[in-house]
Amino acid sequence: MDSYSAPESTPSASSRPEDYFIGATPLQKRLESVRKQSSFILTPPRRKIPQCSQLQEDVDPQKVAFLLHKQWTLYSLTPLYKFSYSNLKEYSRLLNAFIVAEKQKGLAVEVGEDFNIKVIFSTLLGMKGTQRDPEAFLVQIVSKSQLPSENREGKVLWTGWFCCVFGDSLLETVSEDFTCLPLFLANGAESNTAIIGTWFQKTFDCYFSPLAINAFNLSWMAAMWTACKMDHYVATTEFLWSVPCSPQSLDISFAIHPEDAKALWDSVHKTPGEVTQEEVDLFMDCLYSHFHRHFKIHLSATRLVRVSTSVASAHTDGKIKILCHKYLIGVLAYLTELAIFQIE
């Protein structure tokens, strides 16, 4: 599997997304009020096993293919105020002008030496769990071709997409003035992500926050993705644990043939169509026991930081790579759940 590497840092400290995505908004105050009126939501003890994609017929196969096999950085996003799908062309123009202005100020915006770029907003029709979910949309920064041929496509410099899959718990808390797309995924330079995030925050009174994935949720991902029925496996099932030690940390990698991982899951799985917390714990305990039997190492004393399967791979620092279009909606549904939980 491809290893996850930290993005290169930029000289300017202000180029980091966390330096831009700060400050409370009126919507946050509204959500805080909702939190006080509702009980604390515990992690569900069971979840549905992801089924084959329920993408609608109007989904663009080329756009779906474009989203796969790329490493995305995850963010949660509060609802967008007064966002309109009918204004996507105008948003493209305004964001394009904003990026050029920021580049002229000397800020770290990685669009090349010239300003010959184009920002494109487009919908991702069918990329949702229910009819109630808002349509997902894609934002791209593309370098304009210097050639006269209009058919020549420019190089994609940065991509981000916004989605909501089975987001009922958040949709029920906000008014019609807000568009709820709690999950944001970005691919490209962090400096570009920061600039674009700043524009969205100023324009739609929203708030971005990096979405990390803790070891508990990685275990759920490992179980749910291992449970998925595959026509053929495209990747080894792999786990990566981090061992805190001085002077530097130590990583332990454990690779399993995907069919063996599925057989192990089937041996602990008792609830048809669902994954329970007990089954997740048993699945991971079996892996720990197997590893200890062969290598005399107690993995329970380490921290799970990455899970890789034929469905997707995820890292604790909020990086994900989706590999299988059949289970795209299932993967996004769980990520949406995590994003909503972070917002609430």
UniProtKB/Swiss-Prot annotation:
<feature type="modified residue" description="Phosphoserine">
    <location>
        <position position="39"/>
    </location>
</feature>
<feature type="modified residue" description="Phosphothreonine">
    <location>
        <position position="43"/>
    </location>
</feature>
<dbReference type="InterPro" id="IPR025204">
    <property type="entry name" value="CENP-L"/>
</dbReference>
<dbReference type="Pfam" id="PF13092">
    <property type="entry name" value="CENP-L"/>
</dbReference>
<dbReference type="GO" id="GO:0005829">
    <property type="term" value="C:cytosol"/>
</dbReference>
<protein>
    <recommendedName>
        <fullName>Centromere protein L</fullName>
    </recommendedName>
</protein>
<dbReference type="GO" id="GO:0005634">
    <property type="term" value="C:nucleus"/>
</dbReference>
<comment type="similarity">
    <text>Belongs to the CENP-L/IML3 family.</text>
</comment>
<comment type="function">
    <text>Component of the CENPA-CAD (nucleosome distal) complex, a complex recruited to centromeres which is involved in assembly of kinetochore proteins, mitotic progression and chromosome segregation. May be involved in incorporation of newly synthesized CENPA into centromeres via its interaction with the CENPA-NAC complex.</text>
</comment>
<keyword id="KW-0137">Centromere</keyword>
<dbReference type="GO" id="GO:0000939">
    <property type="term" value="C:inner kinetochore"/>
</dbReference>
<dbReference type="GO" id="GO:0007059">
    <property type="term" value="P:chromosome segregation"/>
</dbReference>
<keyword id="KW-0539">Nucleus</keyword>
<dbReference type="GO" id="GO:0005654">
    <property type="term" value="C:nucleoplasm"/>
</dbReference>
<keyword id="KW-0597">Phosphoprotein</keyword>
<feature type="modified residue" description="Phosphoserine">
    <location>
        <position position="53"/>
    </location>
</feature>
<comment type="subunit">
    <text>Component of the CENPA-CAD complex, composed of CENPI, CENPK, CENPL, CENPO, CENPP, CENPQ, CENPR and CENPS. The CENPA-CAD complex interacts with the CENPA-NAC complex, at least composed of CENPA, CENPC, CENPH, CENPM, CENPN, CENPT and CENPU.</text>
</comment>
<keyword id="KW-0158">Chromosome</keyword>
